[in-house]
Amino acid sequence: IGIESTIVDLTEDIPMILRPGYITPKMLEKVIGEVKMDPGIIASDSLQKPKAPGMKYKHYAPKADLILVDGEEEKVVAKINALAKEAVLLGKKVGIIGTDETIDRYPEGEVVSIGARSDEDAIAKHLYKLLRDFDEKEVDIIYSESFATPRIGQAIMNRLLKAAGHQVITV
């Protein structure tokens, strides 16, 4: 579906999710009871190193810098528009990842929809393809809305954070 599998360490008393994926913590808890998250996949600082090998480095990153913008939808759209306008004025080619609900509100740059915000499966499925498409379009910088959706949103955000090298602007 675009997002890799969930990795779970079962060698401890309480199983630990080493990489969030399509199987959510709630799904696991229904089958095996309490689970915890590897602190290294939650923390953005370099002090907490993830245990899963594929989680330790900037992963599936596009060639362009990727910056996530997180917050309330209206503020996110306004901030991405301001950042995109500034980048265009500096002569940069801008990519923007929005949703079906927001793409019409971005006048600058190469704007693509990752899907409907409510369709987590589509977001997960299209994530890496969109990043590769921006490579082909040779954009200099990509601004993306955040996708903290309730079901597999944690896995989606985990992959976006890794691709962005944890560059996040909160508005």
Please give the residue ranges for each predicted region.
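Active-site-adjacent structural elements in enzyme catalytic cores
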Residues: 1-171
